[in-house]
Amino acid sequence: MTGTDPAHRPGAAHLAGPVRPAPPDRPRRPAVLIGGAAGTGKSTLAAALAPRLGAALLDLDVATGPLTEVIARLTGRSDLSDPQLAALTRTPRYATLLALAADNLRAGRPVVLVAPFTAERTPRGWATVTARLAAAAPVLVWLRLAPDRLVARLQSRAATRDAGKISDPAKFLSTVDPEPPAVPHLALDAARPTADLVADVLAHLAHPGFAIDGKA
């Protein structure tokens, strides 16, 4: 993208790719996937958005974190962001998250998912998401934030899982992909107030193909 792209103007919300809601006669429950680097405020946005949608809130760290910590101890790793640990656990962690989402969707409940969604930013990864959430109309929300603000947020929240990132900010930032997803998505500036971000997502979902709170 060039510097003139509206997605890169402060305060801008940008929709990349075509909107593909379900046909009006077959409304689907929304499945909102909130992705972005650590520190962009994914969990904060999800916690504010889920009640507005009457949605189940599914967080990758909450759903799979305790088991990941056990595996880390068994394999002698203390850094949860260790690449070798990620290689062991990423596939089953995301499979668990998507399976929980699919169960809720089959029960008629919208879902809001929280995870970095790095592989899911690619056409191949997104195809896996849409296949597993076939009962839904998945929407990828990508939160972006300037590098210095990312580091400041991580230092402020001081979460155990961020210890490795905080100890070596330069190394952490080298792993952050600044490019937007290569699939249709809603790009949001994470520096904006949470209420404004929620409003942007709700506006994006205001299509006849989405069923929210039991209403088409």
What are these regions, as identified by a protein language model?
Residues 34:
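Hydrophobic anchor at the beta1->P-loop junction of P-loop NTPases
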Residues 37:
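P-loop (Walker A) phosphate-binding loop of NTP-binding proteins
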Residues 40:
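ATP-binding Walker
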Residues 43:
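Walker A/P-loop
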Residues 47-102:
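Conserved substrate/cofactor phosphate-moiety recognition/catalytic segment
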Residues 88-134:
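Glycine-rich phosphate-binding loop used to anchor ATP phosphates in small-molecule kinases
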Residues 133-154, 188:
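Conserved phosphate-donor/acceptor-positioning beta-strand/loop module used by diverse small-molecule
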Residues 156-200, 213-216:
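Small-molecule kinase domains that catalyze NTP-dependent phosphoryl transfer to phosphate-bearing small molecules
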